[in-house]
């Protein structure tokens, strides 16, 4: 066994201070399929990966404690087809989501991207390669 055997990201856990709002965001705004739902653990399927939410504080194996003031949020990137970036932008605006950066081409990355935030202030990117 070695670290070279890692094949993919199985799941990502977002530590939440606003669990209800964040659950609603990923279910209702993003439209992700709810796989498991409890007060302390919510999982959505996103392709082969699970996006999981849990409250900050004591958990199954450890206590992350309160958010560190001034700490950076994470960035989650979700890949779509090139025409879908602009369609996602229109859908998010219609749902009242504040856009951090509207659809923009990033030639050095060969990406078209769109950025916004979830209720926990994590940066969410919708991107497409071109």
Model-derived segments and spans:
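Vicinal oxygen chelate
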Residues: 1-9, 33-81, 87-117, 129-130
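Conserved active-site tyrosine of GNAT-family acetyltransferases
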Residues: 22-27, 92, 121
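Short glycine-/small-residue motifs
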Residues: 123-126
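Secondary-structure boundary/capping motif
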Residues: 20-23, 113-114
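Short hydrophobic beta-strand elements that form part
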Residues: 13-14
